[in-house]
Amino acid sequence: MNTKYIDLINQTFDFPQEEFLLDKDYLRFHDIDLNKLVETYGAPLKFTYLPKISDNINKSKVWFENAIKKHSYNGNYNYCYCTKSSHFKHVLNEALKNDIHIETSSAFDIDIIETLKEEGKINDDTFVISNGFKRAQYITNIARLINNGHQNCIPIIDNYEEIDLLSNEIYGNYNIGIRIASEEDPKFEFYTSRLGIGYKNILPFYNKQIKGNPKVELKMLHFFINTGIRD
């Protein structure tokens, strides 16, 4: 089992990365002199290079477009920006330039969604994938969003209690997804694929809570895979 910080870095990043360049012992990022930034603002320093956000979103879209054509796949690819990666307004505004949808992870993310709707930056056609463990306020906020007409808000069911909790607060019918626990073999102590409904319990869970439930319709299966699937 690898437990050192360098193991986490090696697990998360591939080196070298094209964004970085060493120029006479000074590090540049997208041709930005990082030494000058540190001299100006001090260190530690965190900044966001906005053009790369759109570049990566569109790169992902091209990958999927090519794969869909290659395999004659009949479905569509919808890119969802995960708010927990950054809640900063300037980051969200850059991402939203690219015809995307949104994934939320907590109660205040729904407040952000409602603000974006008020500003006209998203609308009822925007998919809002509500992921994560749902405490009481998160349940209430999701229900409020759906009750106010955002039928494209799809809560991802993370455990056996969430359907009942949501149904108690959502007035009409609504769509759901199921988070499937990948149950991959943990190769690191930094293991994050533990949440969701286990493979063996999917059908019993569906038959018991979804199949005969007139309020909910299953629209999505959600997998979180950290280092890949082994068949």
Spans of features found by a protein language model:
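A charged N-terminal "starter" segment
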Residues: 1-174, 178, 204-207, 211-217
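Surface-exposed loop/turn and secondary-structure junction residues enriched for glycine/proline
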Residues: 48-50, 198-200, 219, 228
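Active-site-proximal beta-alpha loop/turn segments in soluble metabolic enzymes
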Residues: 181-194, 220-231
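Alpha-helix N-cap and loop-to-helix initiation/capping positions
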Residues: 43, 193-201, 231
